[in-house]
Swiss-Prot record:
InterPro entries: Arf1-5-like, P-loop_NTPase, Small_GTP-bd, Small_GTPase_ARF, Small_GTPase_ARF/SAR. Alternates between an inactive GDP-bound form and an active GTP-bound form. Intrinsic GTPase activity is almost undetectable in vitro. Activated by a guanine nucleotide-exchange factor (GEF) and inactivated by GTPase-activating protein ARFGAP1. SMART domains: ARF, RAB, SAR. This is ADP-ribosylation factor 1. GO terms for cellular component: cytoplasm; Golgi membrane. Residues 3-16 are annotated as: Important for the stable binding to the membranes. Its EC number is 3.6.5.2. Its main location: Golgi. A lipid is attached at G2 (N-myristoyl glycine).
Length: 181
């Protein structure tokens, strides 16, 4: 009985530390998302050369979020951030129809990596406020998300500048990371 109560207490009240890797093509909105969730406000961003790392507290989880630049010359460096990753946030510019195939290739390249085999996947279909943005269903189709088997994944429509959908995405991450560990 004591062990059960101890486990229940730890599950409900103890902070859990998790490592999140947030990637996507350049200008998808990764840094805007990171600081909107961290600070609750939109900050002026410049293209990320290298990475930003911040700790975000959400419910009972302390997320260490690594926001890695998405320019094509930087993408080969993503693999250096894979180790010990619990969750992958892949950010897509839903308005960028010309590069959605590039986004799909990068996402599938990553999920086939051995070091990321246990990471859960959250896709943020960002920039939903733009008039020609693809819906989450269309992004799901274009990224071939339904071909991802034996992996937990979820897609969330977002507008980083307004904060729409961000907390719902982190809520999904929290629920699934709590169940996984």
């Amino acid at each position: 009985m004591g062990l059960y109560v101890s486990r229940l207490f730890n599950r409900l009240f103890q902070k859990k530390d998790v490592r999140i890797l947030m990637v996507g093509l350049d200008a998808a909105g990764k840094t805007t998302i990171l600081y909107k969730v961290k600070l609750g406000e939109v900050v002026t961003t410049i293209p990320t050369i290298g990475f930003n790392v911040e700790t975000v507290e959400f419910r009972n989880i302390s997320f260490t979020v690594w926001d890695v630049g998405g320019q094509d010359k930087i993408r080969p460096l993503w693999r250096h951030y894979y180790s010990n990753t619990d969750g992958l946030i892949f950010v897509v510019d839903s308005n960028d129809r010309e590069r959605i195939d590039d986004a799909r290739e990068e996402l599938h390249r990553m999920i086939n990596e051995e070091e990321l085999k246990d990471a859960i996947i959250l896709v943020f279909a960002n920039k939903q406020d733009l008039p020609n943005a693809m819906s989450a269903a269309e992004v799901t189709e274009k990224l071939h998300l339904n071909t991802i088997r034996e992996r937990n994944w979820f897609i969330q429509s977002t507008c980083a500048t307004r904060g729409d959908g961000l907390y719902e995405g982190f809520d999904w991450l929290t629920t699934h990371l709590n169940n996984a560990k």
